[in-house]
Regions:
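Membrane-embedded catalytic scaffold of the fatty acid hydroxylase/desaturase
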Residues: 2-169
Length: 169
């Protein structure tokens, strides 16, 4: 993901600056580059999670998109590798939305993208690991392996959650 962001910005800078005289940073609604690094990473993580949640809702709600996402839900037994089982078209949906969100917040450095991506992948593996681990009272706030088992159940409750890292979503 870090390479994608870095490459996207370079191509965008070359194209937009040469053709239109526009810099990538001019799309930013706010510029968080001057914020402390920990707060930039936190914003990036929450923003990425929101984009994934939004895309995940679309994948479940629309039949044409569900046809792609059902590959992920077709796993017979949960395990950490289930996190990486998905149709390639899901990336086509996720990545542009995530890149747009990053541009609107003034962009992030590739190193930050790597840190957030690594954290998200680690959490995703944990949530798909088929272990009985909840976070006590925080289980109502953060997605966890037990909650995610319900999400992958064959018969879902009416009020199913689409959350990726946060249970409240």
């Amino acid at each position: 993901f870090a390479i994608v962001i870095s490459g996207f910005y370079k191509v965008f800078q070359l194209f937009s600056l040469d053709v239109f005289g526009i810099e990538a940073t001019s799309f930013a609604i706010i510029d968080i580059n001057q914020w402390p690094m920990w707060s930039q990473l936190l914003v990036f993580f929450v923003l990425s999670d929101f984009v994934q949640w939004f895309t995940h809702v679309l994948l479940h709600r629309f039949d044409v998109l569900w046809r792609f996402h059902k590959v992920h839900h077709s796993v017979k037994e949960m395990g950490f590798a289930a996190h990486l089982r998905y149709h390639w078209m899901e990336n086509v949906l996720y990545k542009p939305l995530k890149l747009l969100a990053v541009m609107l917040l003034g962009g992030f450095e590739p190193e930050q993208a790597f840190i957030v991506h690594f954290a998200a992948i680690s959490i995703g593996h944990l949530n798909h690991a088929n272990i009985k681990l909840s976070y006590g009272p925080l289980k109502y706030v953060f997605n966890n392996p037990v909650m995610h088992l319900y999400h992958h159940a064959y018969s879902l409750p009416k009020e199913k959650s689409y959350g990726v890292n946060f249970g409240i979503s």
